């Protein structure tokens, strides 16, 4: 009986070796290979901006153009970033930048109120000065202070940094502020006499007049509202944007600013 059991065991072993690959049993004893995940694909950076001539705007060919836009292209290309630029009304651009990771917004002024909401890359633009512009024909308007402007109607972009500033100084929407999401409508309102002032930079209002074939002499500065020497226009990122991507952009921007003077 003992010989039968031994023979049967040898027979089963031989049968298993004929059916299974010879190294199957040994495979379980070998260390399993370590699978190294492939690197993540390049991050596509979403870039948003607004219509703010001559810094960022949509040209006649439907392309995003402007002095700031050109610099953004140069910086992001130098950083090796994959990106796409889209233009939105300012309030929508801000909402996208504040709610969607891997998003960058420009040209945005770095203020204490905005500081904690973004990761910053500065400066993008030279300092700018904003003025209250009026029609040259409106000699009846006299301003000695910003408070004097509260007696009039001022047109400006909703949600812009100067909107935030005027609200902090006691101005009110619907009372002495005429707010719009469309920057191109502001100059039209001023020329039509629907508002008393337009608040913007000299570069912006002169470019707006040029676009509609109106002479610069039609408007003059009634009051310098704010010198933004201490609040430079920047590029800003959603806080959850890839940190290495942000650092790449910062390095590229610093190098660009070192090599060139302004945008």
Where are these regions (language model features)?
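Short helices/loops that flank or line small-molecule/ion binding pockets
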Residues: 91-103, 184-204, 211
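Bacterial N-terminal signal peptides
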Residues: 9-21
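Periplasmic-binding protein-like
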Residues: 49-51, 127-130, 214-250
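Extended ligand-binding regions for polar small-molecule ligands
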Residues: 66-78, 138, 151-152, 160, ...
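Short coil/turn segments
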Residues: 51-53, 60-65, 110, 135-140, ...
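Ligand-binding cleft/hinge of the Venus flytrap
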Residues: 70-81, 146-150, 159-181, 209-216, ...
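Extracytoplasmic small-molecule ligand-binding "clamshell" domains
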Residues: 29-117, 179-180
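Acidic, polar ligand-binding/catalytic clefts
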Residues: 73, 86-148, 222-229
């Amino acid at each position: 009986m003992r010989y039968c059991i031994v023979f049967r065991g040898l027979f089963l072993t031989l049968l298993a070796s004929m059916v299974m690959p010879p190294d199957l049993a040994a495979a379980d004893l070998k260390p399993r290979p370590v699978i190294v995940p492939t690197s993540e694909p390049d991050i596509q950076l979403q870039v948003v901006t607004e219509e703010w001539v001559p810094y960022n705007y949509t040209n006649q060919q439907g392309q995003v153009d402007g002095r700031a836009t050109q610099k953004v292209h140069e910086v992001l290309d130098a950083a090796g970033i994959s990106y796409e630029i889209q233009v939105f009304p300012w309030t929508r651009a801000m909402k996208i930048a504040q709610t969607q990771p891997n998003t960058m917004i420009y040209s945005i002024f770095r203020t204490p109120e905005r500081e904690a909401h973004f990761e910053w890359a500065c400066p993008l633009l030279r300092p700018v000065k904003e003025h209250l512009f009026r029609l040259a024909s409106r000699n009846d308007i006299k301003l000695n202070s910003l408070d004097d402007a509260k007696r009039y109607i001022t047109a400006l972009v909703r949600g812009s940094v100067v909107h935030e500033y005027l609200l902090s100084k006691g101005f009110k929407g619907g009372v002495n502020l005429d707010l719009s999401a469309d920057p191109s409508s502001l100059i039209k309102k001023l020329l039509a006499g629907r508002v008393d002032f337009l608040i913007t930079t000299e570069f912006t209002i002169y470019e707006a007049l040029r676009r509609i074939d109106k002479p610069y002499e039609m408007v003059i500065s009634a009051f310098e509202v704010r010198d933004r020497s201490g609040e430079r226009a920047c590029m800003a990122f959603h806080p959850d944007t890839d940190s290495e991507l942000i650092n790449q952009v910062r390095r590229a921007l610093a190098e660009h600013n070192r090599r060139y003077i302004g945008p």
